[in-house]
């Protein structure tokens, strides 16, 4: 009988040992250690055991790294290749050997569409809407889990739309304007809360043809095309406290003539009308001031902007990428000193760039 009890205890002890994340360590201490492994090695961690894979794909892992300030930001770029198919690449901006790498293949149904948007909320990147030559605007949404490196179907939009703008504010995705089906409201916008789903709204100040957007000071700004008659830039701003869209500051809107990005509360715009020149909006004096020009040898317009911390990344055709620190930006003979990242061998057009932090 004692022998059976001893064997049972040994089996129980073995099960506990097998279940431990790291043999001989309590799980909380194991998580403390594993969470400090740089993000670029997380794919390797998943191969060690099923428990490690489950951990590194879990909300617990995501929340722990975020709370301990261990999370790292990577840049994701949605591109379109020569065959008019969508593809997506990722860049680790802190890697000593920075280069763009393809991520898990996009869902087949979305690869040939046009007018799709991407947005990031938490550890997920969403691929929204779109249309085709023989396909009306769709409400389909696909969700990419950056921890699991896998795509799944997401909650569909309230309104089918394509060629629209997306932003995140107060932990919600805003899908604004664009073209929809014949029955859809051209002045509509949708909000997505993961706990509630999509809710549709309407405002007469929303117009379908949106070219750019950004979030600054807790407000969403959208810009439409420049009028060929008046050269006037139509821009509106959303105030979440009132739920109303109203016309944006005319002086600010007048200089918003290219892709925009906000870093540390400051708005920057890339003027691509003659070369590539970075402009900065001075809130206090309400004027646009030039930061400097970028070397034409490094940039390949049309470009997109994305910011990580105080560094701005200018991403152009073929994912040619220029990185500059706005606090340390230096001009030499009118050209900004910057570092660059090798482009791909292809000439893919960059549709949008977003940051995802894990």
Feature map (PLM): residue ranges:
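CRL adaptor-proximal regions
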Residues: 1-24, 32
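Short hydrophobic alpha-helical "box" of cullin-RING ligase substrate receptors
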Residues: 21, 25-56, 61
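Conserved short beta-strand element of beta-propeller blades
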Residues: 22-24, 63-82, 107-128, 141-143, ...
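A common structural microfeature
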Residues: 30, 42, 72-74, 85-88, ...
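Beta-propeller domains
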Residues: 80-105, 136-137
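Beta-propeller blade signature
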Residues: 87-95, 139-148, 186-196, 233-242, ...
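Predominantly a core beta-strand signature of beta-propeller blades
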Residues: 97-103, 150-153, 197-200, 244-247, ...
């Amino acid at each position: 009988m004692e022998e059976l009890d001893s064997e049972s205890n040994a089996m129980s002890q073995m099960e506990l040992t097998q279940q431990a994340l790291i043999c001989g360590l309590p799980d909380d201490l194991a998580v403390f250690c594993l969470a400090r492994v740089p993000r670029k090695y997380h794919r390797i961690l998943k191969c060690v055991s099923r428990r490690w894979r489950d951990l590194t794909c879990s909300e617990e892992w995501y929340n722990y790294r975020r709370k301990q300030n261990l999370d790292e930001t990577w840049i994701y770029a949605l591109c379109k290749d020569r065959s008019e198919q969508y593809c997506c690449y990722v860049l680790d901006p802190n890697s000593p050997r920075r280069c763009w790498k393809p991520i898990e293949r996009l869902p087949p149904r979305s690869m040939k569409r046009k007018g799709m948007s991407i947005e990031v909320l938490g550890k997920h990147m969403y691929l929204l809407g779109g249309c085709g030559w023989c396909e009306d605007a769709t409400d389909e949404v696909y969700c990419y889990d950056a921890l699991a490196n896998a795509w799944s179907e997401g909650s569909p939009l309230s309104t089918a739309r394509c060629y629209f703008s997306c932003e995140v504010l107060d932990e919600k995705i805003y899908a604004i304007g664009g073209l929809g089906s014949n029955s859809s409201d051209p002045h509509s916008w949708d909000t997505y809360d993961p706990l509630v789903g999509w809710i549709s709204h309407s405002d007469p100040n929303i117009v379908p043809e949106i070219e750019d957007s950004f979030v600054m000071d807790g407000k969403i700004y959208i810009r439409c095309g420049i009028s060929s008659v008046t050269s006037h830039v139509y821009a509106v701003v959303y105030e979440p406290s009132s739920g109303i869209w109203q016309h944006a500051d005319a002086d600010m809107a007048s200089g918003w003539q290219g892709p925009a990005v906000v870093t540390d509360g400051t708005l920057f715009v890339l003027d691509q009308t003659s070369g590539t020149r970075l402009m900065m909006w001075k809130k206090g004096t309400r004027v646009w001031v030039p930061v400097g020009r970028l070397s034409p040898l490094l940039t390949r317009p049309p470009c997109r902007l994305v910011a990580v911390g105080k560094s701005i990344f200018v991403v152009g055709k073929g994912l040619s990428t220029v990185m500059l620190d706005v606090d340390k930006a230096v001009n030499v003979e009118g050209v900004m000193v910057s570092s660059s990242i090798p482009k791909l061998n292809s000439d893919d057009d960059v549709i949008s760039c977003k940051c995802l932090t894990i």
